[in-house]
Amino acid sequence: MAITIPTQIEKCKGAMLATAIGDALGWPNEPRSKNRIEKPKVNDFFVEWTRSCKEPRWHDERILPGEYSDDTQMTLSVARSIIVGDWERFLAEKELPFWLRYERGGGGALLKAARSINDKKELLWQSPYHAKAYFSAGGNGAAMRILPHVIANANRADISALMLDVIKDTLITHGHPRAFLGATCYAFALDYLLRKDTVLEYGELVSAVIDGQQSWGAFPNHDVFGQ
């Protein structure tokens, strides 16, 4: 039986949808999800659960089946920013501060970055009080939101443009090299899958990522924002 390879448009739609689905399925089981159940049962379907929150005051938040976390929220924020244009400025000055009004499950680095822009109109690396925390932020918050950049750069032959966009995005919230490498590595893998027009062989993606480390692991231009 012949296998039909999805078109790039179908892959993009599927990836965006799968992002939200995977987020909604996995969020209750994350160690930092603040799930009231300490060891929740892992399910392959959406569940309702209760999350313990402390902002603006201690309370229990009801999470309905299929609702997603900050990972999908920020993915959509990046997508909207790209659609609007001048995405770096729109993401940092509009989307990120406004996200504080509806955020769910945001990590420490992301929250600090958003609050710094919202309260002081400055990025974390511009603040002498937050520089240490910023350059120690090596989580996967940036990697979780870079899918829209892969989609936006799908028609470009040179992957360096995608890597630059991912680095710019990461810079807004994270400063540790691990955060950059995680985001660029993941973006490279997604880009490879998007361009693949035959059935993926066993181990092929791992080999492709290893072989492509000169692309996703390259030292970036020190002045990526042109400032």
Per-range role (PLM):
Residues M1-Q227:
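Structured, active/binding-site neighborhoods that engage oxygen-rich ligands
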